[in-house]
Amino acid sequence: MQQRVIISQDIEHDLAQAITETEHDRVFVLTDDITQECCLPKVAVLLTKHNATTITIRHDDTNKTLATLADVWTALQRGGATRHSLLVNLGGGMVTDLGGFAAATFKRGINFINIPTTLLAMVDAAVGGKTGINFGGLKNEVGAFANARYVIVNTCFLDTLDTANLCSGYAEMLKHSLISNAQMWAEHVNFDILQPDLAELQRMVAASIAVKEHIVADDPHEHGIRKALNFGHTIGHALEEFSMPVSYTHLT
């Protein structure tokens, strides 16, 4: 199933349309404790109209575990979810990765919608069909390829994001420009991510997503050209380990 990416100008309108166009008997929304407070209010009225059940997990990648996944399965089960239910993942990459995997495996697969709320999730984690959890001390060790029905991208969520997380996502956009073209690279280098124009950033995010979508369409399961999207991971992770404060998330 191919996912549809919506570059949204009106998050409530676009989410309402996506929910309406996706078969469902019940709606569940997965957040973490931060996005529940900072991001859920932007769509809360709409989700209330659909009698959505909220499932909240703890933030941070250290909680992207089998235990947390089981908590989500349990919440879906207790909430009466069926094969025809819909899960809306509202959060950063941890939420979209784990929520996508929960949806891909619960009842052998239910529909889900991703609403990424961090810049990195917008241009990377929420798009492309990779879902998963950490396991045995290894990142994304267990997972599945499963496309969201919709990925709804709106930079309105970035107004609460700190500088470190903005830079983390922007580094991924710089990588996309390096494997795309010189004009895109020049535009990205000259953009002020520390004082971003969110409307302009949204246009750039759309272009960055298009780079990833083009590659993923040719190699959905990462047997060949899709490995280009991992550009910088090998040396980047080592550099991060030795040069960054442990409180910072990754920049590659």
Please place each PLM-identified region on the residue numbering:
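Short glycine/serine/threonine-rich phosphate/pyrophosphate-binding segments
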Residues: 94-100, 238
